[in-house]
UniProtKB/Swiss-Prot annotation:
Keyword Ribonucleoprotein among UniProt keywords: yes
InterPro entries: Ribosom_uL1_bac-type (IPR005878), Ribosomal_uL1 (IPR002143), Ribosomal_uL1-like (IPR023674), Ribosomal_uL1/biogenesis (IPR028364), Ribosomal_uL1_3-a/b-sand (IPR016095), Ribosomal_uL1_CS (IPR023673)
Record-stated family: Belongs to the universal ribosomal protein uL1 family.
Annotated PANTHER family: 54S RIBOSOMAL PROTEIN L1, MITOCHONDRIAL, LARGE RIBOSOMAL SUBUNIT PROTEIN UL1M
Alphabetical GO biological process terms: regulation of translation; translation
Protein name: Large ribosomal subunit protein uL1
Keyword tRNA-binding: yes
Domain of life according to the entry: Bacteria
Length: 229
């Protein structure tokens, strides 16, 4: 058997047991040894089959403690709405000019927001934005006339989530540098949002497993009951 890297050998904590959420957070932070501020990600296994239309799980949650990320926002809007987006802090605002930049390969953004009247134009970017999960969608508030608020939400802690083929939702919920309490609040907010997004077609146990990990560290299981304690 190949020898494990020293980084893995140094990991501590029981990775098989389900821990109270506060304990899991402490273990994840204790095992984050990278020289950069690692992101912390939650993974939630849901009792759904995304192949069925009535078992899709998708939405957006505003994390109370923020994400710790510098989210770059591109907005498709014109005139007064373009000015509103710029005033709210959007890095890239435009219409046909922004479209042409993206067609030419420009992708220096993490979120795309559009006013409803811009969607005929933005829709033509489906093959570029869609596979990257960047296509604006009214269900998650990224197609809206209220572009200023949408930009503020994106920069202030709004996280989009969508169930993957295996029935798992992955999402960043902060950084190792966050306090334990800040991470705990974000974990609870994320799980609460997933419960509220439970689709009509879901049968049996809905939240089946919750895990927490850092960018370079091990994952730890969370006792589901402790999230709502």
């Amino acid at each position: 058997m190949a020898k494990q890297p020293k980084r893995i050998q140094a990991w501590t904590g029981d990775r098989e047991a389900a821990h109270a959420v506060a304990e899991a957070i402490a273990l994840v932070k204790a095992n984050a040894k990278a020289k950069f501020d690692e992101s912390i990600e939650i993974s939630v296994n849901l009792g759904v089959d995304p192949r069925h239309a009535d078992q899709q799980v998708r939405g957006v949650v505003n994390l109370p403690s923020g994400t710790g990320r510098d989210v770059r926002v591109a907005v498709f809007a014109k005139d007064a709405k373009a000015a509103e987006a710029t005033a709210a802090g959007a890095e890239h605002v435009g219409a046909e000019d922004l479209y042409e930049k993206i067609v030419g390969g420009f992708m220096d953004f993490d979120r795309v927001i559009a006013t409803p009247d811009m969607m005929a134009l933005v829709g033509r970017l489906g093959k570029v934005l869609g596979p990257r999960g960047l296509m604006p969608n009214p269900k998650v508030g990224t197609v809206t006339p209220n572009v200023g608020q949408a930009v503020k939400d994106a920069k202030g802690g709004a996280v989009e989530f969508r169930v993957e083929k295996a029935g798992i939702v992955h999402a960043g919920i902060g950084k190792v540098s966050f306090t334990d309490e800040a991470l705990l609040i974000n974990v609870k907010a994320m799980v609460d949002a997933l419960v509220k997004a439970k689709p009509a077609g879901a049968k049996g146990i809905y939240v089946k497993r919750i895990g927490l990990s850092s960018t370079m560290g091990p994952g730890f299981k969370i006792d589901i009951a402790s999230v709502n304690a």
